[in-house]
Structures are given as structure tokens and as C-alpha cells.
Amino acid sequence: MEAQAQGLLETEPLQGTDEDAVASADFSSMLSEEEKEELKAELVQLEDEITTLRQVLSAKERHLVEIKQKLGMNLMNELKQNFSKSWHDMQTTTAYKKTHETLSHAGQKATAAFSNVGTAISKKFGDMSYSIRHSISMPAMRNSPTFKSFEERVETTVTSLKTKVGGTNPNGGSFEEVLSSTAHASAQSLAGGSRRTKEEELQC
């Protein structure tokens, strides 16, 4: 029994070696001359058929080009059509739609932000302008030393003018009264000068 088992074990590697030898063997030595001639004839026939098919394919391609030229479909038009189709296909994809929506949303946010900044700047300038006007018109501004000094200078000038034109007012008066009286005195002076000019013309 042991000898038989050992014999079986020894035959397995031999079978594998035989298969490798068969796979790498040259079958040409196993073929007869008639079989070789038949295979050679079949090989030539296949090569001829392949050559014929290539010629037919080339003729079909030339005919296709002629038809496209007659229809005005040149290479540039085909490229444009392919590009347009590819662009349309890309626009219909979910990824492109999401990207487009994201960019549009971001653009809207940027526009709104710039608008808010412009509004804030305009409001700030408006507040500054109002503050300046309000500061000038405030009583504190009128009571400031600078404004009082200016008012005193004007009042002194007006008083001197009144003295030259028609005399001073012994009772004094406020700044507004001084200006009013000065304007009235100036009007009377102009009227008197006009009457004297007419009288001189009549005497001449």
C-alpha cells in the first residue's frame, strides 16, 4: 500500500512537466504537409480579406468626407458642434448647477455688501454735514469769543459809519438795531444826494 501511494505521488510532477512540454512544443512538426498547405492558404485568404476591409473602410471614410463637404460640415463646424454639445452637457450636470448657484449667491451677497457700505458712507457724510450746520447755528457758537469779537468789530465799524453819515444814537442798541439803523441812514443819505443833484440841474 505504501509503495502504491508513493508511486502515485511520484507521477503527479511528471504529468505537470508533460503539460508544459506540450504547451511549448512546435506543432509544425506534428502537422502533415497537406495540413500545412491548408493553413497557409487560409492565412493568405485572411490577410487578403483584412486588406480588402481596410480599402473598403478608407473608401467609406472618403465618401463620408465628401458628403460632409457638400452639406457644409467642415472640421471647424464639427468642432463647434462638439464643443456646444459638450458645454450643454456640462451645464446640465448637477455639479455645474450647484457651482453656478453658489457663485450667483456669492455675487448677490457681494453686491448687497457694497450697497450697504455706500449707504453707510452717504449717511455718515450727511450726519457730518448736519452736525456742522447745527454747530454753526447753535447759541453756544454765537456766544463764543470769536463770534463776539467779530460782532464787536462790525458794530464798531457801523457806529463809525453812522457818526460820519448822520450822528450816533446815544441810547446804543443791539447788533441787529445798529444794522437796521445803518441801513436806514444809508437810504436817507442816498435820497438826499439824489434831491440835491436834481436841484443843481434845475439851477443850471
Swiss-Prot record:
Modified residues (Omega-N-methylarginine): R133
UniProt KW Phosphoprotein keyword: yes
Coiled-coil stretches noted in the UniProt entry, renumbered to this chain: 22-73
PTM-bearing positions, type Phosphoserine: S29, S86, S122, S131, S149, S174
Chain spans, region Disordered: 1-20
Superkingdom assignment: Eukaryota
Assembly notes: Forms a homodimer or heterodimer with other members of the family.
GO biological process: G2/M transition of mitotic cell cycle; positive regulation of apoptotic signaling pathway; positive regulation of JNK cascade; positive regulation of MAP kinase activity
Name of the gene encoding the protein in the UniProt record: TPD52L1
Phosphothreonine modifications at: T146
Pfam families according to UniProt: TPD52
Molecular functions per Gene Ontology: identical protein binding; protein homodimerization activity
Record-given protein name: Tumor protein D53
